[in-house]
UniProtKB/Swiss-Prot annotation:
GO MF annotations in UniProt: heme binding
Organism: Liriodendron tulipifera (Tuliptree)
Transmembrane regions: 17-37, 43-63, 71-91, 143-163, 225-245, 258-273, 286-306
Main location (coarse class): plastid
Protein name in UniProt: Cytochrome c biogenesis protein CcsA
Keyword Membrane: yes
Top-level taxon: Eukaryota
GO biological process: cytochrome complex assembly
Annotated family: Belongs to the CcmF/CycK/Ccl1/NrfE/CcsA family.
PANTHER family, per the entry: CYTOCHROME B_B6 PROTEIN-RELATED, HEME EXPORTER PROTEIN C
Subunit structure: May interact with Ccs1.
Any one of the GO CC terms: chloroplast thylakoid membrane
Topology of this chain in the membrane: Multi-pass membrane protein
Pfam family, one: Cytochrom_C_asm
Length: 321
């Protein structure tokens, strides 16, 4: 009873802290003149990280197994993983360009875990025999850490595509405006239009420079976070293969979860390959990473919705790959 109450308190504290952090980010985004709010938001995410850590440890103590055996526990661990990724730039002494992705992701996953699932699904249950293995911690934690990193990296790539396509649409619109002007009005009016555009060149160049810097930072962090996630995913798949051989006598069985994990690994392997080719960097590699965003969610939730395969132990009861 004491552990359950403590878990309940820590859940609501962490959720409230992350909500405040997101509010601070929105305020600083809308009102640039307000300074000094970034540091409290960073401290807030650190506090939320420790609250979720305490929640997982508490659940580990009273359930007597590592809390990764059902959907609720995996979602809380996923939220914890987003909190870790949020602190990565701080460790490397970089500007935190991930906060706009990690904080909403953390609150979304935790919010769904606490409010979107039934109360019965919050209760810890005895592990089924297939999960009673030392590989549970290694395999599932690596997979969920990889999901968190790959989701963040994919969302950064989506943001890069949105900014790039908006820029291209703006350029096409201005070009069409001048082209129409050259045919619809007399030459003097067209020259006046052209002069006005040239007068705004310095302002547009300034905006384009900052847009270029933003896309470069998005590309930089997307590549590094996805590389980290790909490493975790590889370790998770390999450890899962060893566990499968112990449990089922075969390293690979091509059940739905394993198949989609392999598809996920392939998509991000292609992304990393495109990054080695300079001509494919930027938009092309971002498109591949954006496709990976959908693939990850299929891999994470797909088998649980279908309720089939070796990794399925009833609807929404296991997310161990």
């Amino acid at each position: 009873m004491i552990f359950a109450t403590l878990e309940h308190i820590l859940t609501h504290i962490s959720f409230s802290i992350i909500s405040i952090v997101i509010t601070i980010h929105l305020v600083t985004l809308l009102v640039h003149e307000i300074v000094g709010l970034c540091d409290p938001s960073e401290k807030g995410m650190i506090a939320a990280f420790f609250c979720i850590t305490g929640l997982l440890v508490t659940r580990w103590i009273y359930s007597r197994h590592f809390p990764l055996s059902d959907l609720y526990e995996s979602l809380m661990f996923l939220s914890w993983s987003f909190s870790i990724i949020h602190m990565v730039p701080k460790i490397w002494n970089h500007k935190n360009d991930l906060s706009a992705i990690t904080a909403p992701s953390a609150i979304f996953t935790q919010g769904f875990a606490t409010s979107g699932l039934s109360t019965e699904m919050h209760q810890s249950a005895i592990l089924v025999p297939a999960l009673q293995s030392q590989w549970l911690m290694m395999h599932v934690s690596m997979m969920l850490l990889s999901y968190a990193a790959l989701l963040c990296g994919s969302l950064l790539s989506v943001a890069l595509l949105v900014i790039t396509f908006r820029k291209n649409i703006g350029i096409v619109g201005k070009s069409n405006h001048l082209l129409i002007g050259s045919f619809s009005f007399d030459e003097i009016h067209y020259l006046n239009e052209k002069r006005n555009v040239l007068q705004n060149t310095s302002f547009l160049s300034f905006r384009n420079y900052h847009r270029y810097q933003l896309t470069q930072r998005l590309d930089y962090w997307s590549y590094r976070v996805i590389s980290l996630g790909f490493t975790f995913l590889t370790i998770g798949i390999l450890s899962g293969a060893v566990w499968a051989n112990e449990a089922w006598g075969s390293y690979w069985n091509w059940d739905p979860k394993e198949t989609w994990a392999f598809i996920t690994w392939t998509i991000f392997a292609i992304y990393l390959h495109t990054r080695t080719n300079r001509s494919l960097q930027g938009v092309n590699s971002a498109i591949v990473a954006s496709m990976g965003f959908l693939i990850i969610w299929i891999c994470y939730f797909g088998v649980n919705l279908l309720g089939i395969g070796l990794h399925s132990y009833g609807s929404f009861t296991l997310t161990s790959n």
